[in-house]
């Protein structure tokens, strides 16, 4: 399985794609939220995400962000 490092470049690429594709402003999703989602995806423990404003109050943006992450990361192993 191909491996992909969770780093600032990956996080920024995801945010840029999200903003371009969904015509959202930069406050729609934070770099911190993206990094947290990537870490949870890596570990398989989604508990930390369930308490975020993104998940609780803006579930639509959360789902859209998941689509963008999958389009970039796919099934690659995050390390």
Task: Write out the residue ranges for each language-model feature.
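Function-determining sites in protein domains
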Residues: 1-79
């Amino acid at each position: 399985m191909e491996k992909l490092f969770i780093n600032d470049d990956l996080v920024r690429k995801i945010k840029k794609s999200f903003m371009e594709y969904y015509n959202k402003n930069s406050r729609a999703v934070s770099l911190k939220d993206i990094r947290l989602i990537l870490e949870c995806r890596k570990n398989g423990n989604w508990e930390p995400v369930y308490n975020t404003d993104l998940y609780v109050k803006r579930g639509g943006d959360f789902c859209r962000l998941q689509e963008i992450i999958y389009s970039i990361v796919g099934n690659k192993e995050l390390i």
